[in-house]
Regions:
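Pyridoxal 5′-phosphate
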Residues: 2-422
């Protein structure tokens, strides 16, 4: 029996007042007073949900891969795209340089960085490869990575090592860590006098484990080791201050938890580390000399012609997050994912992801035999209107646009399809 959506849930929302909330708005200026006037946490998040265009018939719970953007962000992309199509002259496009810098400043403020430390590249993959290819390494050097890193922060190091002769060492952590210190110890014990780089992932898309990235960074900092953090599963989901964290570099994608324009990525590099990294690409805006005319981390976004409309709309996405507040977004994520994990466990599923939120993030994975994963994900989508992924089993990653009713539907769907749990 389909659960898309039930009369019971409609009446529950009606009783709670959600049905009387204002509809979606096109600008953040319209949204701000509505949020301020909303009474009750669930009503506030219901209003946030209404800023996203997806239908209740097909609900995305896979933020680890791709998120929808709020209407205000989409409207900005469309507006500037039409603007360029109507007049693609240099004269008209001149304004995008200022808009890019405004976006950079807002993104930087959101992570506690200086604007000159932020490059807006195309995605996490490109940003990770800037670090991988830009770090001077040679025979005798060692790079330590987490075995659960994304390929662009994993096998990419092997490819580079095959060319330059350095070694790559992988760290394995327990499936259910007893504490954050156990995770710190796993990485600290892998470091040697030859280690030049320690490169980790903040939150794993394969297990949902959240590493204590600040504590691990302190270990690297004491040894003078370059410390890189892939934040594809944390930017836009958890509160980040890169200066307080002490990271040398941090990478992420706008299209995931940040809910921003697609094909824009974040690369943060600490000011005193920028000079030691070489760029991947040199394009016309680099200048005419080996020493670039570009200031700070901008040298890493010298990529040729870009989609100006998406870069301009990054500022709107940053404003959206700032309006809600990073701590509130993180709290909402946990308020959704923790009941999801418990509900799935109660339905008979075995969690891959730790239950303890100190060592887990917004990624929730349950065990599904590999031969049943596609069937489970397809049936959950077709019959129950819940979009997940087959990564590691069944992966569900709720975010700020999801409601408690979505969580209940996901749990009910897995319970209905429990024949594929084993």
């Amino acid at each position: 029996m389909s659960t898309i959506p039930s009369r019971r849930s409609f009446l529950r929302n009606l009783a709670g007042g959600a049905a009387f909330l204002p509809a979606a708005v096109a600008t953040l200026g319209e949204l701000r007073p509505l949020l301020a006037a909303t009474v009750g946490a669930e009503s506030r998040w219901e209003l946030v949900r209404r800023q996203f265009a997806f239908s209740e018939a097909k609900v995305p719970i896979n933020a680890a891969n791709l998120c929808p953007s709020p209407r205000a962000v989409t409207e900005q992309v469309v507006h500037f795209t039409h603007d360029i199509d109507n007049d693609c002259s240099f004269n008209n496009r001149g304004k995008f340089k200022k808009l890019l810098e405004e976006s950079r400043g807002k993104v930087a403020a959101g992570i506690g960085a200086d604007p000159d430390e932020v490059a807006l590249v195309r995605n996490t993959s490109e940003a990770n490869n800037v670090i991988n290819n830009g770090m001077p390494l040679s025979k005798g050097d060692e790079v330590v990575i987490w075995e659960q890193n994304h390929p662009t922060n994993n096998v990419a190091w092997d490819v580079r090592a095959a060319r330059y002769g350095f070694t790559v060492k992988r760290v394995t952590v327990p499936q259910n860590p007893k504490s954050e210190q156990e995770l710190v110890d796993a990485f600290e014990s892998a470091l040697t006098s030859r280690t030049r780089v320690l490169s980790i992932t903040h939150v794993s898309n394969l297990s949902g484990i959240r590493l204590p990235a600040q504590a691990i960074g302190l270990v690297a900092q004491k040894r003078g080791i370059y410390y890189h953090v892939d934040g594809a599963q944390s930017w836009g989901a958890v509160a980040i201050n890169v200066h307080e964290m002490g990271w040398d570099s941090y990478t992420a994608s706008s299209h995931k938890w940040f809910c921003g324009p697609r094909e824009v990525g974040l690369l943060y590099v600490k000011q005193n580390r920028i000079k030691e990294l070489w760029p991947n690409v040199v394009a016309p805006d680099w200048g005419t000399a080996v020493d670039t005319a570009l200031k700070g981390a901008r040298k890493f976004e010298s990529l040729g012609q870009r989609d100006d409309s998406r870069l301009a709309a990054m500022g709107t996405a940053a404003d959206f997050h700032a309006m809600l507040g990073a701590p509130a977004i993180e709290a909402r994520m946990y308020a959704l994912v923790q009941p999801l994990k418990k509900g799935l466990q109660d339905a008979g599923a075995k969690l891959v992801t730790p239950m303890d939120e100190k060592v887990s993030g917004g990624v929730c994975i349950i065990e599904i035999p590999e031969e049943h994963r596609a069937s489970m994900v397809n049936a959950l989508y077709d019959k129950h209107g819940i979009a997940g992924a087959t990564t590691g089993g069944l992966r569900l990653c709720p975010h700020l646009y999801n409601t408690m009713e979505h969580i209940e539907r996901a749990v009910a769907g897995v319970k209905d399809l429990r024949k594929w749990l084993a």
